[in-house]
Amino acid sequence: MAMEYQVAEEKRLLYWLGERLIDYRLPVTIGVLLLTGFFAYCAFQLRLVTSFGELLPQSHPYIKIHNRFAGTFGGANNIMVMVEVKEGTIFTPETLNKIWRMTEAIDTVYGVNHNQIESIAHRTVRYLKVAAGGTMRATPVMLGEVKTQEQADEIRRIVHSAENIYGILVSLDDKAALIRANFIEGRLDYRRIFDEVNERVVAPYRDQNTEIFVAGEPRLYGWVYHYASDVLLVFVLAYCIEWLLRWLYFHDWRGALRPTITGIIAAFWGLGFIELIGFSLDPLMLVMPFLITARAVSHSVQMHDRYYEEFERHGWNKRRAIVAAFAELFVPTFSGITTDALGVLVILLVPVVMLQKLAITASFWIFAITVSELLLNPIVYYYLKAPEPEIVLVRDEGIFRRVVTRAVDAILSRRGQLAVLAFWLVAAGVAGYFVRGLIIGDPTSASPLLWPDSPYNVSHQRIQDKFGGVEPLIVVAEGLDRDAMKDPATLRRMERFQRTLERDPSVGYSFSLADIIRAVNSVFHELEPKWGVIPNNWVDVGGLFFIYFSGSPPTETAKYVDPSYTTAHVTFFCKDHKGENIRRILRRCKDFIFSGQLEDLGIEVEEDKGRTIISSVSNAVRWEQAGPSWLVSTAEHAGPGPFQRGDRIVRVGRTPVGDLASFRSALTVETANASLIDFALERNGSVVEITVVAPWKAVFKLAGGLIGVLAAANEELFRNDVLMNVLGFATMYVIVLFTYRSFAAPLFLLGPLMLANLLVNAYMAGRNIGINIHTLPLVTVGVGFGIDYGLYIVSRAIEEIRSSGNVEQAVRAALLTSGKAVSFTALSMTLVTALWSLSSIRFNAEMGSLLALWMAISYVGAVTLLPVLLIRLRPRFLVREAAKVAPQD
């Protein structure tokens, strides 16, 4: 039976809705339970899967190059197995036979690309052998197992004389050998690869004198899956402790049960939705379900605390208390859920499939809280037995209430207010200093997903120490015509490229076709060092290629060059994958490519007032005109070309040019596959259109390998990071604007939140936690934590000022009621979230600590800075409510 309530006009609809939910409780309950059962069924079908392709920004130019050539030149999913002996060298029959068998074993692991295995015991690793009669052929280093020490000594001699092996696949001290295997990206099963490598490659061959270390992306994610069960234990432990804390706070099993119902229903809906739309759950994102469930529990604690308060206020009438609690908290609860859900959706801006899927599923999951928290809440309370009055009264007499009261009195005193403002001012200044160290990408050479002393990071570091660089950056050299890779100028440009980047401290070594040609030429001339150079004509280069690749199947030569000699690659093996180092290396790559193209065109450029001007023209480059086009020529009649000093470059191809950066971008885009290049030049006040034949035979294209795909991800995050933050805060601003119908109200709520965001970013910088595709979604969800706390306090202050008419009294009452529930929620969730620091997965542990800190800072801002600002600035959206006298029941 419906009851009459004397409430403000804007609340009447909510009270009516609460009554209707109770009246129609049976059909509503059945409907929710049926849907929950369906989603629960879907949730139990959910699998933990990491799809490598979904981690990449597929629209990025680097990823397009990576996808085109990963199957031939190598991708980002390599496993490196290092065999190291403690005593002696690897050149003994026993150790060499281990390497042989381990190489055969890794060739049987699921998903391996059989043509992209590198080992001194694999058929693809060859050396030049001069046979009787002066004939030369490329022969595998090992043809079978080694039976005598003489055979082992011969293999050592071969290795020491081969530039493509010594120092690359065998360490310089002869104590370690490296087996490198690339995996097909469409067949990556990290758990299976991890188990098979352990069973077939590692365990059978490790002994007292032989250590085996394994690293690489598939191995890294294999360890993540290995530790996934630990994450479940942390989750269960955290939730049990949180249940205990709720029981201690409410002194009632209902207070512990009601938020649990909310969390379980929301979890079933969220996990079921992920499976329903065909997505999967990444093991590194397991902390996300915990966070969203925590949000559901947080809202439910507020509702339960208000229900007890209204139960006492309405003379122990359960129905009136249920409806009043529902109606009074509907606005802040719904606004908080909406800001969280829409805030997560801004992740859709990042063109990474995994993040976009996460944005969609997390947003739905958060919206699902409205079902359990708002739609079902009055019904659950109606079915539950009403609490005993003694239990309700004891909540206001416990130690927690006394501590909150004293803290509120201290904060709102005149001296306390000044201390709060001073504290946040100093904190903002200190955070502003440290936040400059926050970077996009990984800040350390070790993997941030696992602890520094984890088996994976120890193995990675040992391999790095022995071989100097194991993380590949692949730059593709794509010719404009067939046989472009036989052009001596192209090979020399490759060689210059290698020497230029090898000066970077983060590049260990490099490899390209130029290395093969120099080595073959030297062997062809009886190992004379002076012949270890690139020949001057196409015919000699082609002959050397024929010598080296003759007798090799196409699948083996394809990893160096395609059958038409149109496309090859330069691979740089980097020492780490730090974000700043990746950016520097890629910048040097771009500088080399750009300067090489300008050198071939015979021009130098400079920027003048946002325009690109040709500053000088080289006399070394001679041109002749062939019909409408200009081409570089060595003919006697060749002369000056189409470019003149002082020309302003207006357009390249169809791409307009402004400053120097736009010219670099235009030149890269328009010369990618073109043999003819159109230029529009402004000369003496008029525009001159010219067409030149590309003076190069091949174009370098970035970038593949692990470093290339990480660079692409980092660039997308850097490009969208600021925009996401702006849109996230803008979304919150709009929602709060409509919630309180005030342009100033969002500023009061977002101000403390922005300061909390600044402090957390400073913490990330100080702890060497970078922004990457794994940390981004959790950081984005964390931004919304503080807004919920503030919404409950402001809404209660507005409600209280209608009774007291005094800002100070209203704010104090809000802190002692909603603020008390906020305090319990924040403190308990901070504690249980911090338990994630026990995880064996460093990423989950650091994210748990980070989000615990975020909750704590957001809470402190909501209960200190926000109320002080409300009291001292007396905003109109709050003061105007004093004129409204709340009707009495």
Predicted regions span which residues?
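Membrane-embedded transmembrane helical bundles of large multi-pass transporters/channels
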Residues: 1-50, 54, 68, 160-161, ...
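Short, hydrophobic beta-strand segments
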Residues: 78-89, 136-141, 175-185, 433-445, ...
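Alpha-helical transmembrane helix bundles of large polytopic membrane transport and channel proteins
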Residues: 97, 101-170, 176, 183, ...
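Extracytoplasmic
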Residues: 143-253, 264, 492-495, 548-601, ...
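PDZ/PDZ-like domain segments forming the peptide/carboxylate-binding groove
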Residues: 600-651, 655-658
